[in-house]
Amino acid sequence: VEETLMLKGYFAQSKSYILYRSERTRMRAQRKSICSLFAEGDALEKILDKVQTDFPEEMYELSRLDEKFRSFLKPEMGESAKRAALTRAAAELTTQEAPHWEFIAARILMHDFPADLSRALDELQLHSYFEKVSYLCERGLYGSYILESYTKEELDEAGTFINPAHDEKLTYSGLELLLRRYVI
């Protein structure tokens, strides 16, 4: 592509393209450096790619996260411990000058939750929002007034209001508190 641009006299465009490609290669290398330390790094790479898109500022470069993360690594660490260390590294990079590391830490923390939740729901054979609410009411974790006040259709409709994209608005401290104290 660069050669064609150069031959046609588009020197500025060629330079821009070369710089763009070089930057993309550098960013990919940063992601791969972190993901190479995990057995299943594909899902994590998608998260880190989105982090690079959403937080393009220099203070949020993944090389900083990689360096901090590697300082926590120990040879005997399993996948779960490594993910916890990566989350901790992102959380510890949070400063007044770089407050968005807390959102990045939350995204990493949230990495395993959907799969864990799906497994738990499959084990309990809960497939609709109504079934989830019914299960929690039966165990006394939700008030029975919910089932008395709403129909199955209304509860299933309420379940459609949940938008996983909003998970990215949670900070690490908020998500950690939510998962530890309130997720049933």
What does each model-identified segment do?
Residues 2-184:
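Extended catalytic cores of very large enzyme megasubunits
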